[in-house]
Amino acid sequence: MNFDMSKLMQQAQKMQEQMKKAQQERENMEVIGESGAGLVTVTMTGKYDVKSVSIDNSLMSEDKEILEDLIAAAVNSAVKKVEENSTASSNIYKMAKDAGIDLPSGINFPFK
């Protein structure tokens, strides 16, 4: 079996390009988290920046603590969606395979 260093470098470069693209896609994504059956919504970017918070007028007469809990739940919902939609970690095995690299399963990558 011959070891082709140039082929390995090409595969690694291709995988690096795919990882960069996946990271850019994550940074450009927007998700909406909600709570209280949609009465509170939070729009968040893939970089975890909150872009907007919307509170239904019907909640304005509610107790302050209830409103705070609903906002926190909506933010947590948005964070969870960003993590679920992250392509960088969820597709790393596919990217490696597409680049011609066969990764063993069970590798813990230092990113999400």
Curated annotation (Swiss-Prot):
Chain intervals for the UniProt region annotation (Disordered): 1-27
InterPro entries: YbaB-like_sf, YbaB/EbfC
Ranges of Basic and acidic residues composition bias in the record: 17-27
GO terms under cellular component: bacterial nucleoid; cytosol
Record has Cell membrane as a keyword: no
Domain of life: Bacteria
Alphabetized UniProt keyword annotations: Cytoplasm, DNA-binding
Keyword set includes Hydrolase: no
Entry's localization field: Cytoplasm, Nucleoid
Main location: cytoplasm
Family the UniProt entry places it in: Belongs to the YbaB/EbfC family.
Function according to Swiss-Prot or TrEMBL: Binds to DNA and alters its conformation. May be involved in regulation of gene expression, nucleoid organization and DNA protection.
NCBIfam families tied to this protein: DNA_YbaB_EbfC
Subunit details: Homodimer.
Protein name in UniProt: Nucleoid-associated protein FTL_1411
